[in-house]
Amino acid sequence: MDAQRLYSFTRRAIDDYDMIAEGDYIAVGISGGKDSLTLLYALKGLMRFYPHKFKLHAITVDLGFHNLNLEKIKSFCKELDIPYTILSTQIAQIVFDDRKESNPCSLCAKMRKGALNEKIKELGCNKIAYAHHKDDVVETMLMSLIFEGRFHTFSPKTYLDRMDLTVIRPLLYMNEADVIGFVNKYDFPVVKSPCPADG
């Protein structure tokens, strides 16, 4: 997949669901994985020719694992000329040491999103972009069917009224295979998660 195709997929999702308006300040959640780096690259590319002017701010929630190195992500954001914030937390200690959770992912996700949303508001952003793609939509829907007995998945665009924050998912029309191909072609600095629960 080339950059032009990436921009095309991303722009179509943004236009179809009215994800970006004039003057938006969009935080992009960066895990260091292939999906979030692709999203950041796509949005930066779209900034050059999208009819609505918007700003970006990359942000990573550091869960507190000692072996996480974000230097490559810092350099990547610097190359793209996007401000980058690392939010340091003790979430790993709370989940694994204090609470000793047998199923840590759910609590970690809640705490991570809570910390992220608060920091985003502090930065003055009005939207947060997540890098969920088409495969994530299908997987979430199937998990919902298996565990809840209903078809349910996340929306392309969601307004969080308590936070006065809008969540957008611009990679919705892309397959994971497309993302992998793009990351490999452009040699993005993917950072492996140090989390012991991350298969």
Model-inferred region functions:
Residues 63-64, 173, 196:
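Short, surface-exposed acidic/glycine-rich loop or hinge patches that mediate macromolecular interfaces
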Residues 1-141, 147-150, 155-156, 177-185:
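ATP-dependent adenylation/nucleotidyltransferase module used to activate substrates
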Residues 181-199:
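Substrate-binding/catalytic lobe of Class I Rossmann-like enzymes that use SAM or dcSAM, i.e.
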Residues 153-178:
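Short, flexible loop segments at boundaries between secondary-structure elements
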Residues 148, 156-158, 194-199:
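Short, acidic/turn-prone active-site loops that include or flank metal/cofactor-
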